[in-house]
Each structure stands twice: as C-alpha cells, then as structure tokens.
A protein has these predicted regions:
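Polybasic/polar functional segments that serve as interface/processing modules
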Residues: 1-112
C-alpha cells in the first residue's frame, strides 16, 4: 500500500499549489513545469499557500497514487530553498520530518 521509502527521489514543488488539483493537473505540472516524468517512479510533493495541506504524487504498481494530508493545527515547516527553481530535491528523512511537522534543524550561530 504505502510504497514510499528512502531509495526513491523526492521533489518538492516550490510554488504554492491549489489543492483542488488532482491526478491530471499535478501530473501536467510535473511534466511541463518541473520537467520530470511522473512515470519513472519519482515522488512529487505539493503544498498549499497556507502550508496546511500537502499532496504527494507517486506512481505505484497499478497506477498513480496521491497521499493527502491536512493539518488540524499548525503549518508544515518546509526547508528553505531557492524559489527560482522548478523543483527542490529533498531527502526521505526531510520528508518524514515535514509530514510529522518537525522543523528541520538549522545551523546554530554562535553569539560574538
């Protein structure tokens, strides 16, 4: 059923996504904007403007799957990335921290 794991490649779409979009529109964005192929088994992550809803698009055996998470409170804490990019590569561990709503660690700066 849930076939996401550490050996897959994960791509975060940097722009806010309208969460009314589903399989066809998200697949179109993967192809036309992100310049990736949804059929190759990679995982594509979309988040809404308010950072309260996430959709994960992935091809599994038998067809496309969308995992959909809506937070009851709080917001997803995304890593910082260059907004000029069409997609941001993230690691499995980072995705799990985002889904569990744990802020990715930042480098601590020492006071001078």
């Amino acid at each position: 059923m849930f076939h996401l794991h550490v050996n897959l490649k994960y791509f975060l779409y940097p722009a806010p996504m309208d969460m009314r979009k589903s399989f066809y529109t998200l697949s179109g964005i993967v192809t036309s904007v992100m310049k990736r192929d949804v059929q190759n088994g990679e995982v594509f992550i979309f988040v809404n403007r308010r950072l309260t809803i996430m959709k994960i698009l992935h091809l599994e055996h038998g067809g496309l799957v969308i995992y959909h998470k809506k937070l009851e409170s709080g917001v997803f804490k995304l890593p910082t990335f260059d907004e000029e990019l069409t997609s941001q590569v993230i690691q499995w561990h980072d995705l799990m921290m985002i889904v569990r709503n744990v802020k990715p660690k930042k480098r601590l700066l020492k006071k001078r």
